[in-house]
Amino acid sequence: MKKYIFGLMAVAAAMFMASCSADEGTEPGGDSKAYVMTNTYSVAPPLDADADFKVRVSTNSATESAYILLEKHADYSKHIAELGQEGYNDFVVKNGGLVKGVKGQSEVDTLFYGLKGDYMATVVAVNAKGQAQAADSVSFTGITWNKVCDGKYKFCAAIADIMGKESVDCELDVDANNPSSYRIKDVYGHGYNLKFRKAKLTSTDEEGNAFNYIIVPKFSTGLTYKTLGTLYMADAYSFTGSEDYLDNGIYADNSLFIYTVYSVSKGAISQP
């Protein structure tokens, strides 16, 4: 079991300028009908988890081949309505791509890249007679990010030592379809973005400046700390679950502050 121990806590400021049969077909050997099951998995850098996704195709011993078709969700719904499920299965075989590596009991991953919006991927299993006998679909939503501005992210001392620099130039982006969802792009390296959500709750700092509270869920920075493994970051509120530690905010000029917690899965970095 992994253990997540309260590690280093520090305040990091990111200053931005505003200018910017039920079981049949599921077991190996002797299956009478082709069967397919699909699952999706998140991808890791250098792939982009906001726009790239992986489909795992699992088939049984009666499956001779499998075909996959990726469509916009609206097109998928239209084709299902027009053709029905069986007709759509034939449509996938005719218009989709052959899943390479599928023959009999198989487990194969297929990657899709650079998607924006809502998509459906459908896989159809075909038997040795060329009959489409089973289908399964999975959905994926690719995020469109709009640039807000350029800025500089400042690391706390311990992380600056690991990064080899005190700050990094970066950009602040907002989700085109969710104005409360933000990311600081590539802050810990290519593909390692710091994402946060703007809360409705507001407050003022000691100087009377108004800000919106923000929430930073736990994520992997892609960094390692000595022999303790992968370094994770979250805000103190997300890490503890206590509102006593909610101390993150974004101002109208897009400058922001985060009460950060860095932790590892094999032990503590240091005690606060």
Where are these regions (language model features)?
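Ser/Thr/Gly/Pro-rich, low-complexity flexible regions
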Residues: 142-272
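Acidic/polar, low-complexity intrinsically disordered N-terminal segments immediately downstream
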Residues: 21-120, 126-161
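Positively charged n-region of N-terminal signal peptides that target proteins for export
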Residues: 1-4
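Sec-dependent N-terminal signal peptides
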Residues: 6-12
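C-terminal motif of bacterial Sec signal peptides marking the signal peptidase cleavage site
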Residues: 16-19
